[in-house]
Amino acid sequence: MSEPKNILLTVDGELREVTHGTTGLDLFREKPTTAVMRVDGLLWDLAREIPAGASVESVDITEPEGLEVLRHSTAHVMAQAVQQLRPGAKLGIGPYITDGFYFDFDVDDPFTPEDLKQISSLMQKIVKSGQAFRRRVVDEETARAEMADEPYKLELLGKKDAADTAGEGASVEVGAGEITIYDNVDRKTGDAVWCDLCRGPHLPSTKLIGNGFALTRSAAAYWLGNEKNKQLQRIYGTAWASKDDLKAYQERLAEAERRDHRKLGAELDLFSFPDELGSGLPVFHPRGGIIRKEMEDYSRRRHTEAGYEFVYTPHITKQHLYEVSGHLDWYANGMFPPMHIDEVRDPETGEITRQGQNYYLKPMNCPMHNLIYRSRGRSYRELPLRLFEFGSVYRYEKSGVVHGLTRVRGMTQDDAHIYCTREQMKEELTTTLNFVLDLLKDYGLNDFHLELSTKDPEKFVGSDEIWEEATRTLAEVAEASGLQLVPDPGGAAFYGPKISVQARDAIGRTWQMSTIQLDFNLPERFDLEYQAADGTRQRPVMIHRALFGSIERFLGVLTEHYAGAFPAWLAPEQVVAIPVAEAFNDYLDDVVAKLRAEGIRARLDDSSDRFPKKIRTAAKEKAPFVLIAGGEDREAGAVSFRFRDGTQDNGVPVEEAIERIVKAVREREVTP
C-alpha cells in the first residue's frame, strides 16, 4: 500500500496539511534561527521526517533548549578541530553544561593557551564552511567498526544500557534506545569529514553557530568523573546565540570574578583556608566571625518567634545509628571513614579482649534529632514539634570539587526537623516555606523560584505509594506559593522528595538555598510514634529543613551578592569615624562612644595616616558609614556622612546622625 501524499500535523499550535516526508527544515524555512524542533515533546533534528499526526514546535536558538543544542554542536566542532590539529587525540565525551560545553581528550601533552587559540581559529573556519550535522541510526556492530580507533567510545557502547549511571556525561553519547552517529558533512562534496557517537540532537548546520563562542580554559579530568580512571585533558567553552550575548556573558563572568568570595574574604580579612587544616576546612577571622554571629543571632531570634525549640547534638556517633537511618547503605561515599575506638588488647599476647566500635563523624543531624524525639512518649498535643540546631556536619567531598565556602567538608547547618501529623503536614509545609522565603528576604535575597526533586528509582527507601503521596503534597504546596516550579527528576535524597528554594543574586546567578524535605521513611526506621486523640499509636510525618543550606555556604553567597559591601546590620565595622585633622580626634571619639552605647560597631581612625589615606582605607574595607568632622562640624555639633558610593551628606547634627545609623542597623536597611 502506497504512502499517503499528505499528512496532518500540529505545527506551533496550528493544524496543517503537509506532504508525506516533510522535515523540520521544510516547516521552519521562514524561521532561520530555529535550532531544533520539539516533536511530541521530544527534541529532534530539523532534518528528520515528521510522522503523521505529530505535534511539532520550533525551538529557537535563543531559547534555553536551543542554547543547549547550540553548545552541544559547538562541542562537536571543537572536537573536530582538535583531531585535525592533533590526529592522535582520542575522544572522550562532549556534553553541554550550564552556560557552555566541554570535551575530553586523551592526548600526549596538555593543551596550552596557544593551543586554544589555534583550535578556536580552526573552529571559526569550520563554522563558516557551513558543514551539515547528519544523524545516522546504526547497529552496535557498525558503531563498533566505525569507532574502532576510539577506545573510550567502544567502552561507552559496552555501557549502552546503563549509560545514565555509567558516569559523568555518558548519557549524552549512548542510551537504552537507538545507537546514533552524527557526521559533520562537507557542504560542497557531501562527504562526512568527521563523526562522533552521539544521541543528539544537533543544529542543521555549523553556520548557525555564528561567532558567539569562545574557548575558556583547559584542565585535567578523570574519564567519566571517576578518579580511578585515566586522567584526560578537558577543554571548556561557552556559546551564545550572538556575539553581543557572548560579550554580555563575559562581562558577567568578569563581574563574578570581582565578587569572588574567596578573593573578598582575604581582602576584607573575613576567613581563610589554612593548608595545615586540610581542604574544605575554613577558619573565620574576627571580622568574619562578627558577620557569622549576626547571621546566627538573627536566625535564632526568628526561629524562637516561629515556635522552634533549640537542641544540641554531638559531632560523632556509633556506626549503628547510620545503619538504622540508612545513611551507610545510601550515603557512605559522602561520609568520612570510621574511627575504630575502645578496642582493648592483652598487652602480652596482643589478643583482643574487648571488641572496639566504629564511630563516624556525622554527615547529617536528622538521626540524632530522631533520638531526641524518641527519648520519651509523645502526644498529638505536642505536634507539630519543631527542633532546631546549628549543627556541625562533615561530608567527604573530593578535593577537586571543594570550592571556597560554597563547597566545604566541615560545615554548620541551620538544621530543623519538624514532626507533625498527616493532617498538619500540608499546613506545616506551607508555613515552613513562607518562613524560609521571609527570612531569606531579610538577608537581602528577593528573587526566587522553586525546584521539586523527585525519587531516584535506583536510590530510595520506602514504598512507591508513600513517595507518590509525599511528592504530590510538596507539589501542591509549591504551586500554591505562586513561584515558578521547576522539576528535578531523580534529584531527591534516598528518604524523601524535596522542594529547594533557588535564589537569584545581584548579578543574575542562581543559587540553591533552602531545602524542605518531606519524609515518611525515617519515622518508620526509627519507630517514631505519638499517641493520637483516640488513644492509638500513630507515626508522625517528618519534615527536614535547612534554611541557609549551611552557614558557610550562605556567607559565601552573601559575600558575592553584596560584593563584600554588606548591609550595615551585617557589616563587621558599621561606622568608621575619620577626623579631618588630629585636633578633632576627641570630638569624634565622643560620637563613637555614643554609637557604641547604642550597640553600634564604631571605630575612630586615630592612626598617623593622612586624611585621604584614611578615606581610601575605609572605602577598601567597605564600611557602610564613614563619619567625618572638622572645625565647622565641631562648632555646629555635627558630622558629615560619606557613603560607599562616594556621595556625602554634610553638616548632620550628631543626634540625628546617630538616630539614622541606629535605624539603618535595627531595620536591616541596605546601605548605599
From Swiss-Prot:
The keyword Transferase does not apply. This is Threonine--tRNA ligase. Its EC number is 6.1.1.3. PANTHER family: THREONINE--TRNA LIGASE, CHLOROPLASTIC_MITOCHONDRIAL 2, THREONINE-TRNA LIGASE. SUPFAM superfamilies: Class II aaRS ABD-related (SSF52954), Class II aaRS and biotin synthetases (SSF55681), ThrRS/AlaRS common domain (SSF55186). Gene3D superfamilies: 3.30.54.20, Anticodon-binding domain, Bira Bifunctional Protein, Domain 2, Threonyl-trna Synthetase, Chain A, domain 2. Homodimer. It is found in: Cytoplasm. Residues 260-567 are annotated as: Catalytic. Belongs to the class-II aminoacyl-tRNA synthetase family. Its cofactor is Zn(2+). Catalyzes the attachment of threonine to tRNA(Thr) in a two-step reaction: L-threonine is first activated by ATP to form Thr-AMP and then transferred to the acceptor end of tRNA(Thr). Also edits incorrectly charged L-seryl-tRNA(Thr). It is an enzyme of class 6 (ligase). InterPro entries: aa-tRNA-synt_IIb, aa-tRNA-synth_II, aa-tRNA-synth_II/BPL/LPL, Anticodon-bd, Anticodon-bd_dom_sf, TGS, Thr-tRNA-ligase_IIa, Thr/Ala-tRNA-synth_IIc_edit. Residues 2-60 form the TGS domain. One of its GO terms (cellular component) is cytoplasm. It comes from the Bacteria. Keywords: Aminoacyl-tRNA synthetase, ATP-binding, Cytoplasm, Ligase, Metal-binding, Nucleotide-binding, Protein biosynthesis, RNA-binding, tRNA-binding, Zinc. Pfam families: HGTP_anticodon, tRNA-synt_2b, tRNA_SAD. Binds 1 zinc ion per subunit. Zn(2+) binds at residues 366, 417, 544. GO terms for biological process: threonyl-tRNA aminoacylation. GO terms for molecular function: ATP binding; metal ion binding; threonine-tRNA ligase activity; tRNA binding. It comes from Micrococcus luteus (strain ATCC 4698 / DSM 20030 / JCM 1464 / CCM 169 / CCUG 5858 / IAM 1056 / NBRC 3333 / NCIMB 9278 / NCTC 2665 / VKM Ac-2230) (Micrococcus lysodeikticus). It catalyses: tRNA(Thr) + L-threonine + ATP = L-threonyl-tRNA(Thr) + AMP + diphosphate + H(+).
